[in-house]
Each structure stands twice: as structure tokens, then as C-alpha cells.
């Protein structure tokens, strides 16, 4: 039977991505890759570790994607493109930094984040597992109340930590974070996988930068 990519996408979005609910690794292909504007590429294990560390749904238990416009790609029938306009209220203590950094747990402020419209896509295997997830591509930075930031960075802005969102845009800072995750504390969220740890299919389409 042909895969209903719209139904599959709607299911994964709300039950498996690690942003709105805990990660469900069983719905991700072994050759899974995640890509966002400043985060990624992340392979399956690094993505699971990162989202398990961030636990956005803990600090924002009512976070919802408010997704719309689910469309099967006419050229790639196993790909679904859609948009989100997420909302969520910061009502619970949140530690997105890593379990060894419990002292940095952020206390809730009761503010509701209204994120701008973001474009996402999911590409599946014929068996119905997600092979490629793209996320957080903001359509208009003048929407919402998170200073134009989307995805996790928007939640930092809403938590009165806009400086964290700004710092995360710095490639050098992300590189330091990756070194810490690799060498000091594996619970720290990675922003990119080591090139050699990415699936062959992804390395073929986006080769690592020359050293």
C-alpha cells in the first residue's frame, strides 16, 4: 500500500520529534538526518540526544505546532512540506543545557510564546520511517512575539534569555558546544554531528566543508 505521507507527517510531528513530545526513535530511520538553518546536520543518535537534553515540552507542556498546509511534494512523493505557527506557555522549570548543569535550570515566567510561521518538511522511507527532517525555516521575522526567532531559540527569547538565542547564531560558539559534547559532557545538546558519523546518502548531497 502506498504511504500516506500527510497522515504519517501529522503523526510524527505530534508524537515523535522531541519538540512537542518525547522523541520516538522507532519512527526514525537508522539513516535519519535533521537539518535546520543553524542546527545540523544531526544523525539519528545525536538528534535523539539533543532533543532529550532540550526537553522543550517539559518547560512548555502545552506547546503545540498549530500546523497547516500539509502538501505532498509533487516531485518527491515520499516528502511532505508544511508550516507551523507554534505556541506554548513557559509554566514549568526547564533545563535545556545538560543534566550536569542542573544549576542552570530556568524558572518559568508564565509567558506565552507565539512563534512566527516556519516551514518544515519530512521525507520518509517506503516503510514509513522518517529519513530526513528539516525544521525552523522562518517565513516572516515580523510575526509572533519571539523577535523573529523560531524553533528552540524562540523559547529562549520567551524565557527572557534573548542573549542565548543570539549566541546560538555564532558558529564559533556552536563549535565550542560541539567540542564539549564530544569531550566533556555527552548530555550537552549537539548542534552538528561529526561529518564521519552522518549517513552516506547525506554526505553525498552535502559534503563536509574543506578543512
Label the model's feature ranges.
Residues 1-211:
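C-terminal and inter-domain tail/linker signature
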Amino acid at each position: 500500500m502506498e504511504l500516506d505521507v500527510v497522515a504519517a507527517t501529522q503523526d510524527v510531528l505530534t508524537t515523535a520529534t522531541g519538540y512537542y513530545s518525547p522523541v520516538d526513535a522507532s519512527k526514525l530511520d537508522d539513516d535519519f538526518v535533521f537539518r535546520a538553518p543553524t542546527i545540523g546536520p544531526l544523525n539519528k543518535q545525536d538528534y535523539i540526544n539533543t532533543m532529550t537534553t532540550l526537553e522543550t515540552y517539559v518547560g512548555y507542556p502545552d506547546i503545540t505546532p498549530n500546523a497547516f498546509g500539509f502538501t505532498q511534494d509533487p516531485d518527491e512523493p515520499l516528502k511532505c512540506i508544511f508550516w507551523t505557527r507554534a505556541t506554548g506557555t513557559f509554566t514549568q522549570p526547564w533545563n535545556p543545557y545538560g543534566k550536569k548543569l542542573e544549576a542552570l535550570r530556568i524558572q518559568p515566567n508564565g509567558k506565552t510564546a507565539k512563534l512566527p510561521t516556519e516551514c518544515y518538511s519530512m521525507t520518509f522511507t517506503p516503510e514509513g520511517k522518517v529519513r530526513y527532517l528539516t525544521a525552523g525555516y522562518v517565513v516572516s521575522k515580523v510575526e509572533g512575539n519571539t523577535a523573529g526567532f523560531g524553533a528552540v531559540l524562540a523559547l529562549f527569547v520567551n524565557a527572557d534569555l534573548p542573549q542565548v538565542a543570539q549566541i546560538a547564531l555564532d558558529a564559533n560558539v556552536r563549535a565550542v558546544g560541539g567540542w564539549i559534547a564530544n569531550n566533556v559532557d555527552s548530555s550537552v545538546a549537539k548542534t552538528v554531528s561529526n561529518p564521519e558519523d552522518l549517513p552516506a546518502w547525506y554526505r553525498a548531497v552535502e559534503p563536509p566543508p574543506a578543512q
